[in-house]
Design a protein with these regions (language model features):
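ATP/Mg2+-dependent ligation/transfer catalytic cores
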Residues: 1-171, 193
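Glycine-rich anion/phosphate-binding loop at the beta-strand->alpha-helix junction
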Residues: 198-255
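Short, conserved charged micro-motifs
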Residues: 95-99, 189-190, 239-242
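Active-site neighborhood of thiol-dependent amide/isopeptide-bond enzymes
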Residues: 184-197, 217-220
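Secondary-structure boundary elements
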Residues: 114-120, 157-165, 190, 197-213, ...
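Core alpha/beta catalytic barrel or barrel-like domain that forms the active/cofactor pocket
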Residues: 120-132, 162-182, 212-228
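Single conserved hydrophobic/aromatic residue that forms the stacking wall/gate
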Residues: 254-263
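Short, hydrophobic beta-strand segments
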Residues: 85-91, 178-185, 231
Length: 263
């Protein structure tokens, strides 16, 4: 890592990646000490200001690395050279903070394994827009690929330098809409790699004077963007445990999602 700084990052409910940067030299101390964080950061919105809350935030937290090593990526032509470290938030006693999204995923996966002797494998497909592109219906078209080929090439090269594998990077249904598809992985690794891939995409776009957005709706007249989650249930020996009855249950849950959750 020749860049002098490494950024310790978390992803929050606003969809932003946030964190703090420290010198690369001595950054191994983060594994033990972490960095200071505050509960009030949970109220930060995607637009910057904090949301209004009834009660004041109290106490302190620690931002610590979730893995032993940071991820480095580079692009010589764009003069990109970055070191990013996926993190998680813990309380001062070292236990996971209740609002840490990565810790929530870890807890859910442990519950699935311990209570039901099951594990998940997921494949993620993330759609995004490059705004300002031609106003044409370009579903999977060659024209849409060629129009953004310089960006897609740079994006792919940065992903490759970061060690992030992907299945495809192609035009989608909307004008200026594209999709990044990742291979099937352990859910925790898949989530980490998706967050890194999104951040890398934004950084590449900024260096090329493009505007990339993962917003679900960018216009009242174009199709929206989403994240597709393809998953399979397995027992602890890796045998498939998807079933017809299970599929019916999942289908019912999907149809009733509006009544059991809010976003």
């Amino acid at each position: 890592m020749s860049h002098p700084l490494v950024m310790l990052l978390i992803s929050d409910l606003s969809g932003r990646m946030r964190g703090k940067s420290v010198p690369v030299r001595g950054s191994e101390k983060l594994l033990e000490d972490g960095l200071g964080w505050i509960p009030a950061n949970a109220a930060l919105t995607c637009f910057g200001p904090m949301a209004k809350v009834e009660n004041d935030a109290l106490g302190e937290l620690r931002l610590i690395p979730a893995e032993n090593e940071p991820v480095s990526f580079f692009h010589e032509k764009l003069e990109i050279e970055q070191n990013w470290w996926i993190g998680k938030i813990v309380r001062m006693d070292g236990f996971p903070w209740e609002c840490c999204l990565r810790s929530q995923l870890e807890s859910a996966l442990s519950l699935l394994q311990d209570r039901f002797q099951l594990q998940l494998e997921v494949g993620l497909e993330q759609e995004f827009y490059l705004t300002g592109r031609k106003d044409q219906l370009n579903t999977n078209s060659l024209e849409a690929f060629c129009e953004a080929s310089d960006f897609l090439k740079a994006y792919a090269e940065c992903l490759d330098s970061a060690g992030i594998e992907f299945k495809s990077l192609h035009p989608e249904n909307g004008p200026g809409q594209y999709e990044l598809s990742l291979p099937k992985l352990d859910p925790l690794k898949a989530a980490d790699q998706l967050q890194l891939a999104k951040g890398i995409g934004r950084h590449c776009a900024a260096r090329m004077n493009e505007h990339l957005t993962f917003s679900p709706i960018v216009s009242s007249v174009t199709i929206g963007s989403g994240l597709h989650v393809h998953f399979s249930l397995q027992d602890l020996e890796g045998r498939e445990r998807n079933s017809i009855d299970g599929a019916r249950t999942v289908s019912y849950t999907h149809l009733t999602l509006p009544t059991i959750c809010s976003v």
